[in-house]
Amino acid sequence: MIKIIKLVAVFFISITLINSALAESSFFEEGKIKYNEKKYEESKFLFQRSIIFNPKDQYSYLYLAKIYKFEDNKREEQKNINTVLLLDPQNEEANYLLMEIELKKSNYSKVKELVENFTKICKKLCDKKPLILESLKNLEPKNES
C-alpha cells in the first residue's frame, strides 16, 4: 500500500514539473508571437509570466527591453538590458541596445568600453559596428590646447 502511495506521489510530482516547464515555454513563445504582431501590452504580460516561471530567461528580459524601448520607458528598458547582460554578458543584441542608450546619454567612456566588448562578441550584428564607431567619433572629447 505504501509503495502505491509513493508511486502515485511521484507520478503527480512528475506531471506538475512537466506542466510548469511547458507553461514557461508556452508563455515565452506566445509572447514572441504577440510581439511580432505588435501587440506589446499582451506580449509584455506574457514575458513577465515567463520570467515568473524562469527568472533566468534572458530572452524574456530582452524582449521586455525592446517593448520598453518602443514605449519610451528608458528606465525599465535599461533595467531589463542590464539583467540580460548579467545573465549573459556575451549577448550581442543587449550590448548593442546598451550602446545606443549610452550614446544618447553622450557617455563616451562607457560607449568606448562597450564597443571594445562588442567587437569581441559580434556575430550577427557586426554590420552595426561602423554606425556606432561613427557616432563615437562625433562624441569624442576634443583636446583644446
Give a label for each model feature:
Residues N36-E37, F70-E71, K104, N138-K142:
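Register position in tetratricopeptide repeats
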Residues R49-S50, T83-V84, N117-F118:
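Canonical positions in the second alpha-helix
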Residues K112-S145:
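Terminal, low-structured helical/coil segments at or just beyond the last alpha-helical repeat
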Residues Y63, L97, L131-S135:
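Canonical tetratricopeptide repeat
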